[in-house]
UniProtKB/Swiss-Prot annotation:
One of its GO terms (cellular component) is extracellular region. This is Dermonecrotic toxin LspaSicTox-alphaIA1ii. SUPFAM superfamilies: PLC-like phosphodiesterases. Its cofactor is Mg(2+). Disulfide bonds join C45-C51, C47-C190. It is found in: Secreted.
Length: 273
């Protein structure tokens, strides 16, 4: 999965997919009542990027729905996975469940079209703080209460705080999550980060008894670091330059080992070599 980083304006969806992304990451900010408000990152952000592009959250969802609904004039067949980077740092811990409920209602209405031929992309809820694990239950309970448990098949989970793997496993357990887990690891492109924890996550994924199904690394903009991440065995690479990742995947050393995921590739299944 080539994951376009910080795609917060509707116009950027096309831009990143046209460069080779089959997945995007979108920032979600919340108001003081735990309502998802904007798709917005703000300053500081990655080096070389405009940090200030934004939409109202529900407007972005409608644009995303168009891009992921077959038959729509804006449909992009390649776009199959969306990571919502939930900026819950502005919330109190006791608002996490509420944030999950409100997020679910917004997605249900504006993205999934109340279950009536809505967007088809798989969705990952990415949470930066392990203490905010109740967001997941708020979200999943709401889908069930609203009569759409089938949409849980489209939903995955990530804790993005680079916490110890054992601590993340615990948070998943507390959230009632077993399966559909993407584990992120990374740092802003302005800084360097080694692959120690990525390798640990990959080992957990491949052990057959870990909690992780997929591992992705962020934010990778250079060919050398792309090769290092692929050599470490990641499933996804988040990038500001999808064309760079595409180029590396076309190199002889990687062409036979990796391919770009399509809609038919289940993002919750651990890949067996």
């Amino acid at each position: 999965w080539i994951m376009g980083h910080m795609v917060n304006a509707i116009g950027q969806i096309d831009e990143f997919v046209n460069l080779g992304a089959n997945s995007i990451e979108t920032d979600v900010s919340f108001d003081s009542n735990a309502n998802p408000e904007y798709t917005y990152h703000g300053i500081p952000c990655d080096c070389g990027r405009n940090c200030k592009k934004w939409e109202n959250f529900n407007d972005f969802l409608k644009g995303l729905r168009s891009a992921t609904t077959p038959g729509d004039s804006k449909y992009k067949e390649k776009l199959v996975l969306v990571v919502f980077d939930l900026k819950t740092g502005s919330l109190y811990d006791n608002q996490a469940n509420d944030a999950g409920k409100k997020l679910a209602k917004n997605l249900l209405q504006h993205y999934w079209n109340n279950g009536n031929n809505g967007g088809r992309a798989y969705i990952v809820l990415s949470i930066p703080d392990l203490n905010h694990y109740p967001l997941i239950k708020g979200f999943t309970d709401t889908l069930k209460q609203e009569g759409h448990p089938e949409l849980l098949d489209k939903l995955g989970y990530d804790f993005s705080g680079n916490d110890a793997i054992g601590d993340v496993a615990n948070a998943c357990k507390k959230a009632g999550v077993s399966g559909h887990v993407w584990q992120s690891d990374g740092i802003t492109n302005c800084l360097l980060r080694g692959l120690t924890r990525v390798r640990e996550a990959v080992a957990n994924r491949d052990s057959g008894k870990g909690y992780i199904n997929k591992v992705y690394y962020w934010t990778v903009d250079k060919r050398a670091s792309t090769r290092d991440a692929l050599d470490a065995g990641v499933d996804g690479i988040m990038t500001n330059y999808p064309d760079v990742i595409t180029d590396v995947l076309n190199e002889a050393a990687y062409k036979s080992k990796f391919r770009v995921a399509t809609y038919d590739d289940n993002p919750w299944e651990t890949f067996k070599k």
